[in-house]
Structures are given as structure tokens and as C-alpha cells.
A protein has these predicted regions:
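Active-site neighborhood of phospho(di)ester-bond hydrolases with catalytic His/Asp-centered motifs
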Residues: 9-14, 35-40, 95, 123-128, ...
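Core catalytic region of metal-dependent phosphoesterases/phosphodiesterases
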Residues: 1-73, 77
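Active-site environment of divalent metal-dependent phosphoester hydrolases
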Residues: 17-19, 41-46, 102, 125-136, ...
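Short acidic-hydrophobic surface loop/beta-edge motif
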Residues: 81-89, 135-137
Length: 205
């Protein structure tokens, strides 16, 4: 990501979840990212939103909550739900979920994005689904960044997005990066849910 170069780096949330070392991930992102948004997992972690406790065997949030320092809890509570950057002719907005449901919205390639958002000059970066894709419209569009840690389409291919804005033109790109899943599974298999291991080994959509 650093090699690609950027004026700013955005993280759309969910540094916690599925794996046991969310605190380390959170600290690294706090140091790296210019914009760090709250995801639904952070919201669950600080009890901002409720979730079925039966899912905690997958999310692994309950075991991490007691380990958080007061300083980290404060930082988690202060994470914004959205980000906006406006340049000549283009308004770029970021959300973990969707513009109409910032924390828990899901946008897929076949999602009917309301016309109010598909306007010239509007561009969006979103996440939550762990599946990268691009939707385009005149002088605008939407990119789902996918996931760095747990892709749901191709498990050994992490993804992030690059947004390039020049004047009133915006280019959206998804970048895939190989994940060393054998090393990851060897390290974490005893600490993560079997469904997470299956996702890492997945080789198709």
C-alpha cells in the first residue's frame, strides 16, 4: 500500500473481530491511517450496538473487551462514522457500511443504490461485505474495498482500493495482495472459528 503512494490513507473500520489480537491491529492502524472510521465490530465492542452473543464464538469480541485499556476505549468511542473529502468537482465519502446505514449497511454488486447517491460528482468508499467491487456512474462511483484480513471471495487475496481524483474525474481501482494463509492458519487456527479458517482457504466467490 505504501508503495502505491497516496495523499491520505483511510481505514473503514473492523480492526477487531475474528482474530484474537484486535488491539495490536487497532494501534497499527491508528499510527498508519489518516482517517480511521468505526466499523460495526468496534461498535459491538464498546456496546454501541447489540449483537447475538452466540456469534461471539466467531467474532471473538467478548474475550478482548476486558483487555482494553481505558485509553483505547476512549479512542474507540471517538472513532467517526464517516469521512468526507471534497476536491474540485468530486465529493468523496467513506463509510464502513453504506451512506444510508453507516455501521451495518451492506452494498453488493447487485445492490440498487438509490438515485440520490448516484449523482455526478459523488464517489463513495465502503466495506463491511469483505467483497471488493466497483460501481460506476458519470463522474462518480462506488468502490467496496473488500478486506485486508479476511476476504470472503478469495481467501488468500487481501484487497484494498485506490481512489484517484483529478479535477472532476475520479478513477476507482481494487488492488489484490497475496495473503500467506498457511502462516496465518498455523498461527491462529486454535484461536479462530472453523468458519474463518474455511474463508481463508476459499478459492472462489
Amino acid at each position: 500500500m505504501r508503495k502505491r503512494g497516496a495523499d491520505s490513507y483511510w481505514c473503514l473500520g473492523d480492526t477487531f473481530g475474528y482474530f484474537p489480537d484486535g488491539s495490536n491491529c487497532f494501534e497499527r492502524i491508528q499510527d498508519f491511517a489518516d482517517i480511521h472510521l468505526m466499523g460495526n465490530h468496534e461498535a459491538m465492542l464498546i456496546n454501541k450496538i447489540e449483537y447475538d452473543s452466540k456469534l461471539d464464538s466467531v467474532y471473538r469480541l467478548g474475550e478482548q473487551r476486558p483487555l482494553l485499556s481505558q485509553n483505547m476505549l476512549n479512542e474507540l468511542r471517538e472513532l467517526p462514522l464517516s469521512a468526507t473529502e471534497t476536491s474540485t468537482g468530486i465529493r468523496l465519502q467513506g463509510f464502513h457500511g453504506a451512506p444510508w446505514d453507516e455501521l451495518q449497511g451492506y452494498i453488493y454488486p447487485n445492490t440498487d443504490v438509490p438515485a440520490a447517491y448516484r449523482q455526478p460528482g459523488q464517489a463513495f468508499v465502503v466495506g463491511n461485505t469483505h467483497r471488493p467491487f466497483i460501481l460506476s456512474w458519470p463522474t462518480g462511483g462506488l468502490v467496496n474495498v473488500g478486506s485486508i484480513g479476511l476476504p470472503r471471495d478469495i481467501g488468500n487475496q487481501a484487497s484494498f482500493a485506490v481512489v484517484d481524483i483529478i479535477g472532476d474525474s475520479v478513477t476507482l481501482e481494487v488492488v489484490r495482495v497475496p495473503l500467506p494463509i498457511d502462516i496465518i492458519i498455523d498461527k491462529y487456527e486454535a484461536q479462530i472459528h472453523t468458519s474463518v479458517v474455511q474463508l481463508l482457504r476459499k478459492r472462489g466467490t
